[in-house]
Regions:
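Sequence/structural signature of outer-membrane beta-barrel proteins
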Residues: 10, 18-23, 39, 48-53, ...
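Outer-membrane beta-barrel domain signature
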Residues: 18-21, 42-46, 55, 76-80, ...
């Protein structure tokens, strides 16, 4: 169940309730956001599976840039203790034909040593989608160029695990054919130490396990 409310100028309140079959695993949360002339603010809290979590964030424009900071602090109901936080600090350059974005992510669920990646994969919080990263410290970036005709778009995105080190690059080219049809071609290229399987399976880096691939896609919108 989801309820959205707009109690006043610039305010938005978003509440969600998820019934997972038992009161023990019941999940619910509420988030309030406020748009001000100088910043967008949000804060909230709730229960997610067996954690109680508080969160807050702010984004503010600085010239042609936008600075973002958000974080979440979980409390484990079973261990009766706080877990490490999850924090993201980012900067975006918007406007014109070029868009740039970069961010640092502190992943409290992640490991500081590749030897512990298997443990992260077995963590229920990873299985529940609370994080998609195995490492503790990560960098992400994106650069996009769209010429004035808006029919062509070139994008390069990347992720970097600062501890392995390992990473990925994702170049993409999109052409707007017209008539609500788009054609895209791109690749996913990873680098880092590859896993070993003998005598025991072991991950030596995060993104080195991903492999590489090339893709093409035709999208039609109705």
């Amino acid at each position: 169940v989801r309820v959205l409310s707009y109690p006043g100028d610039g305010w938005e309140v978003d509440a969600v309730l998820a019934d997972r079959g038992s009161s023990r695993n019941l999940s619910a949360g509420i988030r309030a956001s406020k748009s001000l002339p100088w910043a967008d603010l949000h804060m909230g809290g709730g229960k997610f599976w067996r954690e109680v979590m508080g969160l807050a964030g702010v984004s503010t424009p600085v010239g042609n840039y936008k600075i973002r900071l958000e974080g979440a602090l979980p409390y484990d109901l079973d261990a009766e203790d706080f877990r490490l936080p999850r924090i993201t600090l980012g900067v975006d350059r918007l406007g014109g034909e070029t868009m740039l974005s970069a961010e640092y992510n502190f992943n409290g669920i992640g490991a500081t040593d590749a030897e512990d990646y298997i443990r992260v994969l077995q963590d229920p919080r990873f299985a529940q989608g609370e994080t998609y990263f195995l490492g503790r410290h990560n960098l992400g970036g994106l650069a996009s160029w769209t010429p004035g005709n808006d029919r062509i778009s070139l994008t390069v995105s990347g992720l970097l695990n600062l501890q392995d080190p390992s990473g990925t690059l994702g170049p993409n080219f999109t052409y707007d054919i017209g008539q609500s049809t788009r054609f895209s071609v791109g690749a996913f290229v990873s680098f880092g130490d590859k896993p070993v399987f003998e005598p025991d399976p072991r991950l030596k880096s995060e993104f080195g396990t991903y492999g590489d691939f090339v893709y093409s896609m035709l999208s039609v919108y109705f």
